[in-house]
Amino acid sequence: IKESERWQASSGEAPHLAVLFSPSLRAATRAALLVSLTALLGWWAVNAFVPLLGSLLAGDVARAEGLAPEAAQRLAEAWKSNASNAFNLGGLIGALAAIPLAKRWGRRPTFIAYFLWSAAAILLTFGLPLPPQTRLAMLFVVGLGVYGVFSALVFYLPELFPTRVRGLASGFCYNIGRVIAAFGPFAVGAIAAGAGGSSTVITQTVVWVAAVPLLAALLAPRWIVETRGRSLPE
């Protein structure tokens, strides 16, 4: 496959990471880090607990209804699957909506909308004393924002940087969040061990995740670079 003329013209010595923090690219790097870190941290912090939460919510129902151990186990397996499906379905719809919204509203307003939706959905889903069935269904609403925002990264990050550093910049900004999220399995294990079979510990933990997209929404008007209608940087 022939490389594009633009890429060939910009190829040569590989750029150093420091170039991302040069005066000409500093604002773009800051915007990319903000949206990437917010999306990755918000998604991981919720998604990591979704199957466990489904199982523990089922346990709450089983105890309330006095189900036999075999029936309780079947219910837990079904709710684990339903919790993941609800979250992922919301993410799919949210991802499909991001592109037309970004075209209509612009990139910055779209990110702000997704971040505010995510914060509100997390607060409502994990902060209110909801019945287990309602809390399970609300994972769909959480997925719309927390998971759906990822599709906006696909077109936004390349729009920020010139060809010669586009791959370096996108990879660096996106993978910073992945490095931080690598500590996630240890946190999940520790919190699950202290849950004691109740969903309360999980909900009281995850509700604090709302601070991540809320802070990003407050920073977005100054930090997120609007790229709608702009040509890709050379």
Predicted regions mapped to residue ranges:
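Interfacial helix-cap and linker-helix signal at transmembrane-aqueous boundaries
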Residues: 54-55, 101-102, 188-197
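C-terminal ends and interior cores of transmembrane alpha-helices
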Residues: 116-130
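Extracytoplasmic gate region of multi-pass secondary transporters
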Residues: 26-92, 181-185
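Helix-to-loop junctions at the C-terminal end of transmembrane segments
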Residues: 94-106
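Flexible cytoplasmic inter-helical loops of multi-pass small-molecule transporters
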Residues: 1-18, 230-234
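A membrane-interface helix-boundary motif in multi-pass transporters
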Residues: 193-211
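Cytoplasmic membrane-interface "Motif A"-like loop-to-helix N-cap segments
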Residues: 104-115
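Multi-pass alpha-helical transporter architecture, strongest
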Residues: 128, 210-234
